[in-house]
């Protein structure tokens, strides 16, 4: 049996403020930090151990992983940081309050942007200061790989190369994998692992800071999965 544990980062400052976050690099709230520590405690009490960890290049996920590692006495654990595990890029909506955006564009339009599988939000302009090209952590990416806004379909297509090239081989080699990322990058993996339809995946919500344990067979097909809280 192969072991994969997925954790969405703890509550972030913009989660609390009800803003579209995406690739904006906001930090955890005190509550979010506590959620991360609690996740580590629950994993430790349940006897989980890990050989490698994966996370995004955004601090709310990285700090969540640090707190889990610290609680589990696993600060030595090898960690792979990848932009492919970043949150879905919300384009020109980044930083906007969700309720105020709904007032401006209408509830139905915002619902489509948030919950449609293949409809992108309004894209960033190339001159926008929020463009990822202005961030040094993405300086080595090809310009064609840098999103200006993503739907969940784009997010799935971004995450799967990392799964196929790194995470899946690690699992098949017997490594116990901890992955700390974001709501939509984790939903992308859930969709792939559980073969969830395009329609049904839109109703899947991933809670902050609660470990989602997958037990997989040798072909990496799910035997069972459950939340550990």
Curated annotation (Swiss-Prot):
Alphabetically list the UniProt keywords: Gluconeogenesis, Glycolysis, Isomerase
From which organism does this entry originate? Polynucleobacter necessarius subsp. necessarius (strain STIR1)
**Which InterPro entries does UniProt cross-reference here?**
His_Pase_superF_clade-1, His_PPase_superfam, PG/BPGM_mutase_AS, Phosphogly_mut1
- SUPFAM superfamilies in the cross-refs: Phosphoglycerate mutase-like
| Reactions that this protein is recorded to catalyse | (2R)-2-phosphoglycerate = (2R)-3-phosphoglycerate
Protein name stated in the entry = 2,3-bisphosphoglycerate-dependent phosphoglycerate mutase
Quote any Pfam family the record assigns: His_Phos_1
Q: Which PROSITE patterns match?
A: PG_MUTASE
Marked site positions, Transition state stabilizer: 182
MF terms per GO, please?
phosphoglycerate mutase activity
Q: What class of enzyme is it?
A: isomerase
Question: Which Gene Ontology BP annotations are present?
Answer: gluconeogenesis; glycolytic process
> Subunit details for this protein?
Homodimer.
The active site consists of 9 (tele-phosphohistidine intermediate), 87 (proton donor/acceptor)
* Family statement: Belongs to the phosphoglycerate mutase family. BPG-dependent PGAM subfamily.
Q: Where does substrate bind?
A: 8-15, 21-22, 60, 87-90, 98, 114-115, 183-184
What does this chain do? Catalyzes the interconversion of 2-phosphoglycerate and 3-phosphoglycerate.
Q: Does the keyword Isomerase apply?
A: yes
């Amino acid at each position: 049996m192969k072991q994969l544990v997925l954790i969405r980062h703890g509550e972030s400052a913009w989660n609390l403020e009800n803003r579209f976050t995406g690739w904006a690099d906001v930090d955890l709230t005190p509550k979010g930090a506590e959620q991360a520590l609690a996740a580590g405690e629950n994993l430790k009490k349940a006897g989980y151990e890990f050989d490698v960890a994966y996370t995004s290049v955004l601090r709310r996920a990285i700090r969540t992983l640090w707190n889990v590692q610290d609680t589990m006495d696993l600060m030595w654990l090898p960690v792979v940081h990848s932009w492919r595990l970043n949150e879905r890029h919300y384009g020109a909506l980044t930083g906007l309050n969700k309720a105020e955006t709904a007032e401006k564009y209408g509830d139905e339009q915002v619902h489509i942007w948030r919950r449609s599988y293949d409809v992108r939000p309004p894209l960033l302009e190339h001159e926008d200061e929020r463009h990822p090209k202005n961030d040094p952590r993405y300086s080595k990416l090809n310009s064609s790989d840098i999103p200006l806004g993503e739907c969940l379909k784009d997010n799935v297509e971004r995450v799967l190369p990392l799964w196929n090239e790194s995470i899946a081989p690690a699992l098949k080699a017997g490594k116990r994998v901890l992955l700390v990322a974001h709501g939509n990058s984790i939903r992308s993996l859930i969709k792939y692992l559980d073969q969830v339809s395009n329609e049904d995946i839109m109703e899947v919500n991933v809670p902050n800071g609660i470990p989602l344990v997958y037990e997989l067979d040798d072909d990496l097909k799910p035997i069972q999965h459950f939340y550990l809280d």
